[in-house]
Amino acid sequence: QAGHDIYLTLDLKLQQYIETLLAGSRAAVVVTDPRTGGVLALVSTPSYDPNLFVDGISSKDYSALLNDPNTPLVNRATQGVYPPASTVKPYVAVSALSAGVITRNTTLFDPGWWQLPGSEKRYRDWKKWGHGRLNVTRSLEESADTFFYQVAYDMGIDRLSEWMGKFGYGHYTGIDLAEERSGNMPTR
């Protein structure tokens, strides 16, 4: 019979718990099993009642969903594209170590900001007075932004893009959901 060979990895209690935590907010949470890649929970809020579509949605209800400033029809978990923030740092570290751009012993001084050569703009670290002299291990421990700005700059956009692509940046996850969007990974 149709559908009898479909097996889900969703954990219903975890899914419901996350939905409760996110109630009233605009957010997304995806929880996966690191051993299998199976999706344990995938939550996007706000959501909507899918039963509205079962027998054909009224134009009034559909207009309300389309015009809702909280955009409940957008699945933030699969269609949202977000800056990776500090989660990118371990990948930059592995990439730079593997490419020979840095070693475990490479140190850089972090004054609390980083400046792109030829630019006046300073990119501030979360710790405004800086972290001082850091190697890659300490930079990860302290989540030092400027260390990774410099290392990424030293890698160059082509090499950085190639390495980040190996970790899945800029690619689809393969979750088998038609609405999924790939992330952005800049290239030259």
Task: Map each language-model feature to its residues.
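Conserved, well-ordered alpha-helix/loop/beta-strand core segments that scaffold catalytic motifs
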Residues: 1-28
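Beta-lactam-recognizing serine transpeptidase/beta-lactamase-like catalytic domain environment
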Residues: 10, 35-87, 91-188
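Short hydrophobic alpha-helical segments used for membrane anchoring or interfacial signaling
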Residues: 29-34
